[in-house]
Amino acid sequence: MIFLTTLPLFWIMISASRGGHWGAWMPSSISAFEGTCVSIPCRFDFPDELRPAVVHGVWYFNSPYPKNYPPVVFKSRTQVVHESFQGRSRLLGDLGLRNCTLLLSTLSPELGGKYYFRGDLGGYNQYTFSEHSVLDIINTPNIVVPPEVVAGTEVEVSCMVPDNCPELRPELSWLGHEGLGEPTVLGRLREDEGTWVQVSLLHFVPTREANGHRLGCQAAFPNTTLQFEGYASLDVKYPPVIVEMNSSVEAIEGSHVSLLCGADSNPPPLLTWMRDGMVLREAVAESLYLDLEEVTPAEDGIYACLAENAYGQDNRTVELSVMYAPWKPTVNGTVVAVEGETVSILCSTQSNPDPILTIFKEKQILATVIYESQLQLELPAVTPEDDGEYWCVAENQYGQRATAFNLSVEFAPIILLESHCAAARDTVQCLCVVKSNPEPSVAFELPSRNVTVNETEREFVYSERSGLLLTSILTLRGQAQAPPRVICTSRNLYGTQSLELPFQGAHRLMWAKIGPVGAVVAFAILIAIVCYITQTRRKKNVTESPSFSAGDNPHVLYSPEFRISGAPDKYESEKRLGSERRLLGLRGEPPELDLSYSHSDLGKRPTKDSYTLTEELAEYAEIRVK
């Protein structure tokens, strides 16, 4: 824009009307296009008392002092001028009317400079005015853009050209305004401190796309080839818009992740990476990376990019999904239940993607769910069979984890059918196997003796627990006659169960009773057969008379063993025998039956030949009854 600082013309005229002193007025600066002309308006004044007959004047170039011999632009007295101004300068004003307006034609760059006027009234009445005008020779129109152009807000851009040549008048037009929507153009002529300016106003609403747009103005002079163009680039301010950002990102745990955020704005934005309200990185830039080294599941989540400047802000988010194997499952729920209750067990874990969850027991799948982080196991009316160890397994394509847990079902005692009594000679052992939770108490009752023995009496009862099974063994000795009835009773806080224990191997007792008589008969028959064979064959004259003497043969005691797996080897203790006999001898029981016999094995030796004596093939057994 051209700024002129000289006083307005009307102020000079007022001052001149008062008269009485030397003075001049002209614009301090004036401009014109190269090749055109310019009219420099000028008025001067002098004291009224001088009253000259003729007034002359001189225009100098770049110096007001004649002593310096400055180039003469115009001289009214002699018409002698500097060669640079030959045919280019003439006076438009009437010096007698104190008008010193100068016209310069066919302007060229070397004519740009300071122009001074000197009044010549004759004699010593000559005066060079200090006021001067600076001529600027231009080649382009002046485009004025507001200091701040904001997108979306209407703006006015002006094109100004000097209009100080009375012979050539400029015509203005806009260039490159087609991409500015629907602009409007206004034109006017404006006086600016004695000079004239042709002005064209362009109104439009800029967009962010108009930033950097090259807008031009053209000044053309009709009937000539003179055209002058000027251009200006639009600096459109607009708020940020995020134009580049990652879409959802999937990364495996431990890998490197780089998130990019790019924004378009003017001026450049402040970019900020944030997560959960915490600033992770920020910088004034058009794009900003956020690098995450060895990502963990804790870094999984939503990341936000915020772009802002003085004209607004924008933000966008990106989801980072960290893929990882399931964590060790956690189990919440009932671990102890009473038989018949409903048990609810919740198994949960965390993984990405969600895992396949499975609950199984002893390789049998009880419940499973696909792509869920929780699995609920419902066991209605639990039974003792539900007691035991369970596993919750979580797996996805990145790994597998498992957790074991135990369910303890509490129930009343159950005496198993394998419970029984067994007798061997004078020893009776009773086995009572109880399934129970919690551990029960076990007692053996002998109704015929009116005696009850429990596991605290370790001389008679041995107990051992394995899991839910409790095995109790009652050992009775000195039972030569029929063994007594034995009832096993087990109880805990949930109930009581009793069972009369059946006897196994009862035929052994029968053989123990008839054994002495049968043995005598068997030996008698054996002797008869031997004698018959001896007399028949007459091969050998052998006289044998078998003799059975109690003193010749030691007692051989037959005591078959009855053992239960895990039972202690304490049955031969003398103290035990004494205690057991005292227990069984209560209430006037009959005395013990001591049966001693030796066993005869008729088939021990192989047959030699048909002449071998039967006595040589058989062993004998002595049976003694007391």
Curated annotation (Swiss-Prot):
Lipidation feature positions (S-palmitoyl cysteine): 531
Gene3D superfamilies from the UniProt entry: Immunoglobulins (2.60.40.10)
Chain ranges of the Ig-like C2-type domain: 139-237, 241-325, 327-412, 413-508
Topology within the bilayer: Single-pass type I membrane protein
Sugar-bearing residue positions: 99, 223, 246, 315, 332, 406, 450, 454
Amino-acid positions noted as binding a ganglioside GT1b (d18:1(4E)) in the UniProt annotation, renumbered to this chain: 65-67, 118, 124-128
Region listing for Required for normal axon myelination in the central nervous system, in residue ranges: 577-626
Any one GO molecular function term: carbohydrate binding
GO cellular component, one term: paranode region of axon
Pfam families (alphabetical): C2-set_2 (PF08205), Ig_3 (PF13927)
Tissue: Detected in myelin. Detected in olfactory bulb and throughout the brain (at protein level). Detected in brain.
Disulfide bonds listed in the record: 37-165, 42-100, 159-217, 261-305, 347-392, 421-430, 432-488
Cellular compartments annotated: Cell membrane; Membrane raft
Domain of life from the UniProt record: Eukaryota
Phosphoserine PTM positions: 545, 547, 549
Disordered: annotated segments: 581-608
Known role: Adhesion molecule that mediates interactions between myelinating cells and neurons by binding to neuronal sialic acid-containing gangliosides and to the glycoproteins RTN4R and RTN4RL2. Not required for initial myelination, but seems to play a role in the maintenance of normal axon myelination. Protects motoneurons against apoptosis, also after injury; protection against apoptosis is probably mediated via interaction with neuronal RTN4R and RTN4RL2. Required to prevent degeneration of myelinated axons in adults; this probably depends on binding to gangliosides on the axon cell membrane.
Subunit note: Monomer and homodimer. Interacts (via the first three N-terminal Ig-like domains) with RTN4R and RTN4RL2. Interacts with isoform 2 of BSG.
Domain notes for this protein: The C-terminal cytoplasmic region found only in isoform L-MAG is required for normal myelination in the central nervous system (CNS), but is apparently not required for normal myelination in the peripheral nervous system (PNS). The extracellular domain is required to protect against axon degeneration. The first three Ig-like domains mediate interaction with RTN4R and RTN4RL2, but are not sufficient to inhibit neurite outgrowth. The two C-terminal extracellular Ig-like C2-type domains are required for inhibition of axon longitudinal growth. Besides, the two C-terminal extracellular Ig-like C2-type domains are required for protection against apoptosis after nerve injury.
Name under which the protein is recorded: Myelin-associated glycoprotein
Source organism per UniProt: Rattus norvegicus (Rat)
